[in-house]
Amino acid sequence: PSYVLFVGDVAQIPSFSGNTGSHVSDLYYCTYDGASDIYPDIYYGRFSANNTAQLIPQIEKTLMFEEYTFPDPSYLDEVVLVAGVDASMAPTYGNGQINYGTDNYFNNAHGFASPHVYLYGSGSPITSDQSIASSSILNDVSEGVGFANYTAHCFEQGWADPAFENSDISGLSNTDKYCVIVSNCCLPNAFDNQACFGEAVVRANGKGAVGHIGASNNTYWNEDYWWAVGSGSISANPTYSQTGLGIFDCLFHDNGEPVSDWFTTLSQIVHSGNLAVTAAGGDEEYYWEIYHVMGDPS
């Protein structure tokens, strides 16, 4: 098999305790080359649910994507990209990640006519440090986006600043316009928590996300930047030629990358990001342990 989907929360399918910190990790269900192996042989994800009411929305959203039964699929060309608030790190790390995405991929040449971009400090119509940023992002998601990426600070219940938290999910109105969310930040997929952000946003019935990618423990600015952009020097304006392959490159793979570097499913996105951390000499074992897919890995 190429994929495994765990169905249930930790009470139904226990997770492993990480070797590199106090976090849960499903990694070791999928490594088969001895105790020191940290590279999964099977792509994996989790439908975290304690009951059928939490499970059924995840199945229904996934089937809509699998069968392509969207009433209006045009929303898939909408994206939200957020460099969250951190006065010290966001101008280079956060803005660099988002700038790399828009310069190379999330642009008109790739069918994204008007990406909803929130840079820190300056450079976008609404910056992430403005008071209206949170409500604007929630409105974007409610109107329908296919993909959302946030990089900055989080906690177990969601994005910190601009805020997008568990308590905001009930107010969303994106029925039949579900998104994939990638949260490069601390703890949004801490699925041993009562209900982390990643669990809540995919469990939501008739709204929220079809899948959420995030970490079950704290993340780090260097590694999260490399995870998205690729190995190389940290810059506010990185270029393809100056970096290795990160998740954006492997997802779009339109620069002549070999087929072996095409990573397009949710669990493959995680895999490509972790490979970038490995290539950069970052804290690889920790990252292979903490990044998870809440949703269908395939």
Language-model regions, residue ranges each:
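Cysteine-dependent hydrolase recognition
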Residues: 1-298
